[in-house]
Amino acid sequence: MDEEKRPKPLPPSLRGRRRYIAYQVISEDKFIFQDLINSIWHSLLNLLGELGASQADIWIVKDTYDEKKQIGIIRCSHNNVEQVRTALALIERIGDVRVVVKVLGISGSIKATQMKFFEETKLTEFTKTL
């Protein structure tokens, strides 16, 4: 595409405000990530309906899901954070596995969410400087 025909990106003042929700899945057994996505969408659609789910602007960030710790991030609109938290709390099963989805916290950027809720404290950060 030519540079002249490309649409201009929206300025930050016109973009939607987003929040990133860190969640942890506590389960009795292992499950497939795609089943988790299906359960989240099923819960959102049951609680909010199609119109509410589209207004919530949900995006499940696949690259940030840690299968070992079962921690992930969901992006949503700043107006719908509480509805998304409620939908996550209503998830009881992923496939045939009984689960509890715990919200770890909310942040305004993916980087801050990862630093707060994913990173383990490293002992090298506490070295004494003289």
Feature locations, PLM:
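A common structural junction motif
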Residues: 44, 90-99
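Short, low-order "capping/linker" segments at domain edges
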Residues: 110-130
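The conserved glycine-aromatic submotif of the RRM
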Residues: 65-73
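Beta-strand cores of modular interaction/reader domains in eukaryotic scaffold and signaling proteins
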Residues: 22-24, 73-75, 102
